Amino acid sequence: MTLEAIRYSPGSLQILDQLQLPEHCHYEALSSVQQASEAIRAMKVRGAPAIALVGCLSLAVELRAGAGGPGLAALVAFVRDQLRLLVAARPTAVNMARAARDLGQVAAQEAEREGATEETVRERVIRFAEDMLEKDLKDNRSIGDLGARHLLEQTNPRGGKVTVLTHCNTGALATAGYGTALGVIRSLHEMGRLEHTFCTETRPYNQGARLTAFELVYEQIPATLITDSMAAAAMAHRGVSAVVVGADRVVANGDTANKIGTYQLAIVAKHHGVPFYVAAPSSSCDLHLETGKEIVIEERPSQELTDLNGVRIAAQGIRVWNPAFDVTPHELITGGIITELGVFAPEELRGALSASVFSEGQTLDSPWV
């Protein structure tokens, strides 16, 4: 049985409440964009691709129930307002913003078509949102295959096995299924070329310990959990062949926003001569921004750092800085950026993706919503 972060059928959306993992597998029904926004903000669902999918599918559920209108203009305005609410839930990940732009345009274009009705606008937006599920899974499979083959060519072309270190959670729980960085690891395992996986606990939210370790055990992939502070020692003494991480936003020059702690992993990897890869769909690539300095970094509540399962573990009165993400400079991404379209050096990204990512009249100046 495959792990599912999202269960969807027309008119019905359920998410696996990831706050309850690994102790309990509980699915929560979402019937509105407001509920989806709250679930995203609370991190019941997380991972840039999954956030976009849940957001758009929650809108599809609302529209199928007849929300929006009356009138075409009011319906298009409703769609755009709901999309803005979803984008604001967690602003660092670009996938939701890109999906909001696309869905908003789909609604507006359909409304302008001769003979358009509220029903045709709803159907067009719903169909677009539902198609995202299939596309994300297909893209993940491509990322896994392309990334695994490139990694093997660069690190062990003679046919041996490799050991990979990863950070946070980038598997089936963060996507429509299979995963991005964890998809590369899964592909290596399926090819019989994976020796071992090291996954970091990923403090302070412990996505690695709670979610990635859960997926690896579930899929029977050989793995060891380490603390974040053990990564350098693992690279020095445990034969790490490559580091593969995901991304919440990759900008035009290749700078990458990902879970806090990614930046220091890239520095350590470069010191040890270990190739450092970013695995992300093209929907996570934001060519509107030139460098990582322009990325808005979400900051999380202090309690996520000072409390554990409701128990205070830090001194009262201590100040807390709790950014959810950091930005890895492109020059530290030495292995490449793995997308469903190929594996690219950071400096190749803009040219390689421009025609594909910004198709159908989109430009670098096109607004997200």
Swiss-Prot record:
- Descriptive protein name: Methylthioribose-1-phosphate isomerase
The UniProt catalytic activity note for this protein reads: 5-(methylsulfanyl)-alpha-D-ribose 1-phosphate = 5-(methylsulfanyl)-D-ribulose 1-phosphate
Q: Which GO terms describe its cellular component?
A: cytosol; fibrillar center; nucleoplasm
Cited function: Catalyzes the interconversion of methylthioribose-1-phosphate (MTR-1-P) into methylthioribulose-1-phosphate (MTRu-1-P).
Identify the taxonomic lineage of the organism of origin: Eukaryota, Metazoa, Chordata, Craniata, Vertebrata
Record carries keyword Nucleotide-binding = no
Q: What subcellular locations does the record give?
A: Cytoplasm; Nucleus
Q: Which residues of this protein are catalytic?
A: D248
Query: Which gene is transcribed and translated to give this protein?
Result: Mri1
Q: Give the Gene Ontology MF terms in alphabetical order.
A: identical protein binding; S-methyl-5-thioribose-1-phosphate isomerase activity
